[in-house]
């Protein structure tokens, strides 16, 4: 085995072409294998993953050349069958960044599908010291959730198989590894790209902790072709867990996703999402005129923005023509009255834009019309490798098509000019997560994969030239969401609710976020840690729109009528979860009527978000306040000299708990009166230092309080 030193890293080259990476007494072993040819048997959203009869190149690679340089090491290997892979490794302190350059010199064209990326880390003998490390990665598994459980105590051999098709870094962070809690050492890996996505098949407890991921890079490879794919990032460091999170955050910053936006101004939004008509056999409201009559009431509840979705049941999420408002919203007179009334009441109006495509059939029961885009612009749609149009339940737009992107920008400007829109909620930006194999486009097939996010930089810039007040809200929910958006969804948080609380609906809950093995097993301390780490790696200037219910989550269950979370968890628990979401430090969204029966409490919380300076302008400290109970949620907020804290019982049982404030989180030499900011009742007077020692509270089932620390 040949060994090279590169800054603080040692890189060894094995006879099979794998790379061994070492630093500070820790090591990782990694390799890339090219997956090619085969067939995608189904024309569905799973085209990128449901592949059959594929071939592999690189399981046993041959070393061709090594070029050591001062700041990097270049390793060239032959994968076989005409493929050559060059690794470019550049150390940056505890981080090692790797770029891969794939070349082809064979005779016959090859259809590249993806690179299989394997990383072997901690050895089995070290599992008793190791816990999972993955800020922003959702540990939503079918067994009890404990972020500090040692690796030898997990039952699942594949710890994270549930996120196999998440498109990191857009729909999960993709950070995976382990932390040695005894020796304070971390090893982790992730992948950064605006073109290629990392989809992880598993994190396996084999002889070593082994990550197996797919770097999706579909294209045809012909003689003389090459493709540069990166960046692969490796972290080996001896440090505390929070310091390791900061290393990850600094790495994500280099991707250029940060924005110079005023986050505190952006998060002062309470958005109401609403659809008119029937969806999932449930009708929230029948007409736009009825909704217009509700605007004053909704404003008085504390909402300051309304998101208007296409008409249901048709066209629903089938695109007809963005600029054909009668076809998309049906009742244009009612829509105009709604917008006018919303603005009169001081509410911003957000239009929902759906990007995946139109249905290519007509259902006479829905009085449906065929989208003119299907015939007028066939080049706007993706093709499968078989030459047919790609589709899920709609024919799939190719979001990398420049003409289609111009149409999107034109449509946004039209809504801003003619319909007085204030912003846009962007749906299904990665729903069409597969390549466009149409070789007449002049674009690479992989350019379609993440184009829905990448395109927003240019679209946003064009729209803001004419309408600088406009804002954009993406369904993505991870660091890559910083591309062209002020707001992002919180779908990376929804798994927390059933992990923290018991599901009481006898029907159960949506399996997308719910596992019976993990239901009600997570402690608030772990949840707070996960929230803090997830928030730390998000791009600056992008605000997470927190929510308990959305139109999507309401239908995930597949039940007739859908399922609101007040139905899943019960009304009392719902109020605790709503408060948590509202005070996690982002914007807030609610689905119309999802809060039915709880309007007064929801209104009180929404108004606090907008009117209390500590929440409007302050900072959320997820882990600064804690309780000696697994099921007591705590949050701490500060702003200048003000402070507030939330304490909520997540369980259907009364309890007495001791709540403690982290030392240094608030001046210990002042006295405060804890006053409930909703009821106005005072709990008592305390020296702030006493909060560090602990204050006892008795909480009835699902009792919750938002306390102001009123200086006396």
Residue ranges of each PLM-predicted region?
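Acidic-aromatic substrate-binding/catalytic surfaces of carbohydrate-active enzymes
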Residues: 2-76
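Polysaccharide-binding surfaces and accessory modules of carbohydrate-active proteins
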Residues: 30, 35, 39-40, 44, ...
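N-terminal structural segment of carbohydrate-active enzymes
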Residues: 96, 121, 141, 150, ...
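Carbohydrate-binding surface patches
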Residues: 162-174, 178-182, 624-666, 708
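Substrate-binding/active-site clefts of carbohydrate-active enzymes
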Residues: 258-259, 265-289, 296, 301-304, ...
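Hydrophobic faces of well-ordered beta-strands that scaffold small-molecule active sites
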Residues: 270-272, 306-308, 349-351, 424, ...
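Conserved alpha/beta catalytic core and glycan-binding cleft of carbohydrate-active enzymes
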Residues: 460-461, 467-597, 610, 620, ...
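C-terminal beta-strand-rich structural cap/linker in extracellular carbohydrate-active enzymes
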Residues: 688-712
């Amino acid at each position: 085995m040949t060994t090279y030193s590169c800054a603080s890293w040692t890189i060894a080259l094995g006879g099979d072409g794998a790379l061994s990476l070492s630093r500070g007494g820790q090591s990782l072993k990694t390799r890339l294998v090219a997956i090619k040819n085969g067939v995608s048997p189904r024309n569905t959203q799973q085209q990128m993953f449901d592949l059959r009869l594929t071939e592999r190149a690189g399981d046993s690679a041959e070393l061709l050349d090594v070029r050591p340089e001062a700041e990097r090491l270049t390793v060239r290997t032959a994968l076989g069958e005409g493929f050559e892979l060059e690794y470019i490794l550049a150390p940056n302190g505890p981080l090692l960044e790797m770029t891969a350059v794939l070349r082809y010199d064979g005779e016959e064209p090859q259809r590249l599908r993806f690179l299989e990326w394997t990383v072997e880390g901690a050895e089995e003998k070290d599992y008793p010291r190791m816990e999972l490390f993955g800020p922003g990665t959702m540990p939503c598994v079918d067994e009890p959730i404990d972020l500090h459980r040692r690796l030898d105590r997990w039952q699942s051999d594949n710890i994270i198989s549930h996120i196999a098709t998440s498109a990191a870094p857009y729909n999960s962070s993709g950070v995976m590894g382990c932390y040695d809690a005894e020796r304070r050492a971390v090893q982790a890996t992730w992948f950064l790209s605006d073109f290629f996505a990392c989809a992880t098949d598993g994190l396996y407890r084999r002889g070593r902790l082994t990550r197996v991921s797919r770097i999706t890079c579909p294209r045809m490879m012909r003689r003389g072709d090459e493709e540069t794919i990166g960046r692969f990032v490796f972290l080996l460091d001896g440090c505390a867990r929070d310091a390791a999170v900061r290393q990850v955050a600094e790495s994500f910053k280099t991707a250029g996703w940060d924005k110079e936006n005023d986050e505190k101004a952006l998060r002062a939004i309470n958005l109401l999402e609403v659809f008119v008509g029937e969806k999932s056999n449930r009708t929230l409201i029948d007409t736009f005129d009825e909704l217009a009559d509700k605007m004053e009431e909704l404003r008085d509840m504390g909402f300051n923005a309304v998101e208007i979705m296409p008409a249901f049941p048709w066209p629903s999420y089938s695109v007809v023509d963005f600029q054909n408002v009668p076809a998309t919203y049906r009742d244009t007179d009612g829509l105009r009255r709604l917008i006018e009334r919303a603005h009169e009441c001081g509410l911003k109006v957000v239009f929902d834009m759906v990007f995946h495509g139109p249905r290519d059939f007509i259902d006479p029961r829905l009085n449906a019309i065929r989208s003119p885009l299907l015939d007028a612009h066939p080049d706007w749609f993706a093709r499968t490798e078989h030459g047919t149009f790609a589709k899920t339940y709609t024919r799939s737009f190719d979001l990398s098509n420049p003409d289609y992107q111009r149409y999107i920008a034109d449509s946004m400007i039209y809504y801003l000019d003619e319909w007085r829109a204030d912003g846009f909620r962007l749906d299904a930006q990665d729903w069409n997560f597969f390549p466009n194999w149409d070789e007449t486009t002049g674009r690479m097939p992989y350019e379609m994969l993440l184009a829905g996010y990448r395109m927003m930089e240019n679209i946003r810039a064009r729209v803001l030239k004419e309408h600088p007040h406009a804002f954009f809200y993406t369904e993505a929910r991870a660091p890559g969401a910083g591309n062209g958006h002020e707001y992002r969804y919180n779908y990376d948080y929804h798994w927390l609710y059933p992990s923290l609380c018991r599901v009481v609906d006898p029907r159960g809950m949506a399996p997308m976020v719910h596992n019976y093995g993990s239901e009600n097993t997570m402690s608030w301390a772990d949840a707070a840690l996960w929230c803090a780490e997830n928030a730390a790696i998000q791009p600056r200037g992008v605000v997470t729109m927190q929510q308990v219910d959305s139109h999507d989550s309401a239908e995930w269950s597949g039940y007739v009528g859908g399922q609101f979370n007040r139905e899943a968890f019960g009304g009392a628990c719902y109020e605790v979860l709503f408060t948590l979401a509202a005070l996690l430090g982002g914007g807030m969204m609610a689905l119309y009527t999802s809060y039915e029966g709880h309007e007064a409490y929801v209104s009180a919380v929404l108004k606090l978000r907008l009117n209390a300076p500590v929440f409007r302008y302050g900072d959320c400290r997820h882990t600064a306040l804690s309780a000696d109970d697994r099921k007591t949620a705590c949050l701490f907020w500060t702003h200048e000299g003000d402070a507030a804290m939330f304490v909520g019982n997540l369980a259907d049982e009364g309890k007495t708990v001791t709540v403690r404030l982290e030392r240094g989180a608030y001046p210990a030499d002042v006295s405060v009166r804890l006053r409930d900011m909703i009821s106005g009742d005072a709990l008592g007077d305390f020296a702030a230092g006493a909060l560090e020692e602990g204050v006892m509270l008795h909480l009835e089932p699902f009792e919750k309080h938002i306390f102001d620390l009123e200086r006396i």
